[in-house]
Amino acid sequence: MVIGASGKTGRRCVSYAASKGLPVVACTRSGAFSARDAGVADASAAALVASERCDVSKASAAELATLLDGAGSCIFAASASPSGGSPWEVDKAGLVAVARACLVAKVPRLVIVSSGSVSKPLSSIYAFLNLFGGIMRAKIEGEDAVRALYFDREGCDYVVVRPGGLTEDEPRGVAAIELNQGDDKSGRIARADVAAICVEAAERAGTPVAADATFECYWADTGKSLGEVGLSNALGGTTDEKAYASGRERRGNTWDELFEGLDADAPGVSQQGWGPSL
């Protein structure tokens, strides 16, 4: 199930899942969804796509639990928009409501699309993006609420995906992607590659792979420290031999290789950093 399927990343999640032969429910505020408009050209793949209405800023707990009943996994790709609620209504309260419903419905895995630098209020990226309705603070508070909710919950886990600067480029695939943990490094990445990461993580529900993990994702050849990445992304910069290395980078030629070795979050522990933007 993909919540926020009408968004740029959400619809790519639906398309990628269907292209893999996975049945997927596309949840939008209106309930309308066109698989063809989302890039699902193959008729047999399009037949795997169903649609449901879900406005996370307005849906009741009972409605969300009913919607999620029987889901094998849930991708939360919803975010604030002029027509769809504020960051506090969607990125925080909406996420928390969906997480609670996932636990009630015993959905094995919740995959959350968040943002790189979200735990670093002193970074220039956080400070800039947070100007838009406090979206970065809403996102990190939503993340941390999920960590608290999932503390010591058997049979259900979460994955937090923190993309770098999102592009509309064609996907480069798993071998081009780098993951990092610690929120001290970022870069650029196509929305289509983020969608692939989310679906691949969701497909591994019920396994230890990436369970309760938070990680950043970006193309390896664009990786920079948070202090450098804003300007680098704006200029289309690439990595050089002097580029910052955290020591926590992950690469792989397959999805299992890419996800291998990711550390789970400290159970229930907040990752919200300190800074003037708070």
Which residue ranges define each predicted feature?
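Cofactor-binding loop segments of dinucleotide-utilizing enzymes, especially the Rossmann-like FAD-
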Residues: 5, 29, 115
